[in-house]
């Protein structure tokens, strides 16, 4: 498994994903089967086979690939205009099986091979967002103070993060910020902070740090706390993610 930071609240993960439990997270996820199909399970026990899927933030799901076929997942911040646009397109059922996904999946694989992770993500997310009427500047979609609050949470990890202090920093009441977060992103403020911590831990794991140390540095109270959040939001144990990163034939690195 390889991980790339793409900037603008985007993260890309590549590898073979199997045996994932149904889970949910604060990001909007775009899953691509680069050379073969994906198996998608939703919380209503619906099963789909496809090459390209978009999962709304907060939707319980599991996206898996054949062990011999590499898949790609792009995670978009729920407060970004791309995240909002794709969540809107997938909002009806929470899981959007993209029509004509084979064409876009093949084109994404080609973009990855030629231009690298950032080029592949820019191409695919741009194509998908082109199907939405969302404003590229995000105006009218995300409350500016909510965007500011989520950016603050992301930049504050692994320090202590609580709703009251973040609300005060963006001049909103805690109750209003909590409601706004749920209304506009589909996930609670606390789920957003747990997701940020998990991503922080994943970055440490990608650097080869032991699970316990990564959990501590990411701000989890202890190993069991990190384990619960990892199962909740990734569908696997931290040790499984660490093993997948270690066994990758290519090291994780920032996207070019």
Regions found by a protein language model. Name each.
Residues 175, 224:
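Key DNA-contact positions within bacterial/archaeal DNA-binding proteins
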Residues 80-145, 149-151:
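Amphipathic alpha-helical segments enriched in hydrophobic/aromatic residues interleaved with Lys/Arg
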Residues 132-145, 179, 185-196:
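Short, Lys/Arg-enriched anionic-surface-contact patches
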Residues 111-112, 129-134, 149-161, 181, ...:
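Basic, amphipathic alpha-helical hairpins
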Residues 85-87, 132-137, 232, 240-255:
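Short, charged, intrinsically disordered terminal tails
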Residues 160-164, 183-221, 227, 244-256:
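Terminal helix-turn-helix DNA-binding modules in bacterial transcription factors
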Residues 1-91:
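N-terminal regulatory/effector-sensing and dimerization cores
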